[in-house]
Amino acid sequence: MFIGVTGYNHESSAALVDKNGVLIDYYREESLSRIKGDKSFPKRSIKKLIESNNLKIQDIERVAFYERPLSSFLHTAKEASLHMPKSLSLLAHQFRNFNRSSVSCYLDFAKQFRGLETKLIYSDHHLSHTLTALAYSNTKKDICSVVVDGFGDRSTASISQVIDPTEINELWECPYPVSLGLFYSTITDYLGFAINEGEYKVMGLSSFGDSNSKLAKLVSGLMDWDSKSNKLISEMSYFDYHLSTSKSYSSKLEDLLGPARNPFVPLIPG
């Protein structure tokens, strides 16, 4: 039996899979802790998986974690260090909360489920996305996998060649901090909605917009594809998500698009 675990950044969960890749059981931490969006180490979910399926620690062959925590930590810290002292608050926050981040995954397993920490493996974040897509695909061979994310390990987007589930080759990646996902979250924040929560509202509101408007053209100009270098490019001076924990956009974005919406002011249809 194998256990897959996610946590610390988004809603935590744990899944039990057999040797054939068949999903046996699954729990979201929030359903057990009764804390909406619970992103803590999913100790209740793992405990429930083991107890509900009459398993012991020795019955678990491997535990897979969905990213490589140290890689993620170091890449964001490295980028922030290039912009000191402006990024001091972000760096301080990262190191201050080190023991509550995914870097502590190994220690949490050792503390809560002694023995499982020795079976822990870390999966590349974008590989995890690709493997998840494969699990729901009727086709398992000769596939092109496109992952567009906020950030994972070192990349924010990737393209991979899937020869079969055991042979996956990454062909292209977009390195942090340029990120289509974080760009979307920044616009979500600018419009007065919560990051990682209000993006669906922006998606819904976009249907009422005008893609030919001056404002739409200004927004589309913030990020582009450079066909010569095959890179996603962005003018990072408009963004602060790689520098701050409290604000994702700079004053320059407000100069370009106008004042950001106050989240406490009701939306009035125009």
Where are these regions (language model features)?
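Short acidic/glycine-rich loops and adjacent helix/strand connectors
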Residues: 1-270
